[in-house]
Amino acid sequence: MAIKKYKPTTNGRRNMTSSDFAEITTSTPEKSLLQPLKNNAGRNNNGRITVRHQGGGHKRQYRVIDFKRNKDNVAAVVKTIEYDPNRSANIALVHYEDGVKAYILAPKGLEVGMRLVSGPEADIKVGNALPLENIPVGTVIHNIEMKPGKGGQLIRSAGTSAQVLGKEGKYVLIRLNSGEVRMILATCRATIGSVGNEQHELINIGKAGRSRWMRKRPTVRGSVMNPNDHPHGGGEGKTPIGRKAPVSPWGQPAIGYKTRNKKAKSDKLIVRRRTK
């Protein structure tokens, strides 16, 4: 993937960048793997906003992704590399030998025509999925399960990767993309390689309208609201927030405040906290 730059024909185009989509091989998704995706604009079933700054944007369809990769010892051939509007990573359409079609996350280096296999006896090759106990120390992995059979939950964004550091009994030590070192059950599965589309983070949106296409609505500063809408609100003209430190609309400190549950049971599985 390369970054495409635009000439400054307008103020919105100046500094705007996008992907050149060179890795994408088709623009038509597999119909059998599509589901309708309703735009709830951040509202719950009561019609109340539960997630701010969402709404509008282009209509989408959900691509059903196989995060479990549990079809053992059945080879699959990569047919296409496709764009997915619902995630930063690209996806790959694979056809299994038994006729089943599935979408998977496209790792870096995956190409059309490559053969993939899942299972404990699979080769250590980009795109293959294995239990962590069968993956050698030092291997780069992604799409990592946290509970056996639940499907991958960690390391799914574009350009991310984790590394196997060691094995201790029924657990495997994993260094995550954040720098956190964590123990995960050895029977959980992961996929070999790092997630593709690694230059996604370099894309410059360029203008407000492009954010609106992506269902992102504007963020209003609390200091320009009324006092009944935000703790920073109120006052005559441009007044300070009237506090030692900024807070969220619900009064939670906004800078340096730890939000993790101090009694989280998973604390015993975290060997080293994240570094960034």
UniProtKB/Swiss-Prot annotation:
The keyword RNA-binding applies. Pfam families: Ribosomal_L2 (PF00181), Ribosomal_L2_C (PF03947). GO terms for molecular function: rRNA binding; structural constituent of ribosome; transferase activity. Keywords: Ribonucleoprotein, Ribosomal protein, RNA-binding, rRNA-binding. GO terms for cellular component: large ribosomal subunit. It comes from the Bacteria. GO terms for biological process: cytoplasmic translation. Disulfide bonds: none annotated. SMART domains: Ribosomal_L2, Ribosomal_L2_C. NCBIfam families: rplB_bact. Belongs to the universal ribosomal protein uL2 family. Part of the 50S ribosomal subunit. Forms a bridge to the 30S subunit in the 70S ribosome. This is Large ribosomal subunit protein uL2. The gene is rplB.
